[in-house]
Amino acid sequence: MKKLPQFVAAVAAAALVAAPCALAQTPSMQHSHDSPPARTSNSPLIDKVRAATARFVDVNVALHEGWVPGTPCVSGPDSGAMGVHYLLLRRLFDGVLNADEPESLIYEPMPNGALRLVGVEFIVLAADWASKHPDGSTPAVDGHLTNYVDAPNRYGLPAFYELHVWAWEHNPNGSFADWNTQVSCDRQAPQ
């Protein structure tokens, strides 16, 4: 559990530094004004996620509601990207997974500095899940099993379970794959 305080401190520090900067930018620099693509889904989970997160197409709404930048844009060497993860810390540490309440919103940085909502990630720390589910069950979100990520990991988190849902951007690898080849960190505006 030594890693958890370090992670919390890192996220808190990032939030203190990034949130004022993000709020100081004009709304046009902070989110895309393009309407989200009209889309129908064969997945009730994707439909639930879209309904629950539609207001966060504008990242300023997420910031106002307490979401904080948790990662820079995460990309893979040949697998596309995940994007920038914004976290709601009270959900991250509650040991619960709820289809209407993702722990992370995922945004793709755009060349003009805007952030475009592309998906969500459900995250539960393994120890928190185990304490509430001593039967050893694997966490699931609306019947979709999560992936286990052991520690140490690139995020500095203790072991956790996660499930990506690409509700706002088509993923050729599947709506629940970790990496999305349609998402890129290469298009972000120079810092």
Task: Name each region found by the language model.
Residues P5-Q6, A15, M110:
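Hydrophobic alpha-helical context, especially transmembrane and signal-peptide helices
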Residues P20-A24:
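Sec/Tat signal peptide C-region and signal peptidase I cleavage site
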Residues A9-A19:
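Bacterial N-terminal signal peptides
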Residues Q25-Q191:
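Primary mode marks residue(s) on the alpha4-beta5-alpha5 output face of response regulator receiver
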Residues M1-V11:
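Bacterial N-terminal signal peptides that target proteins for export
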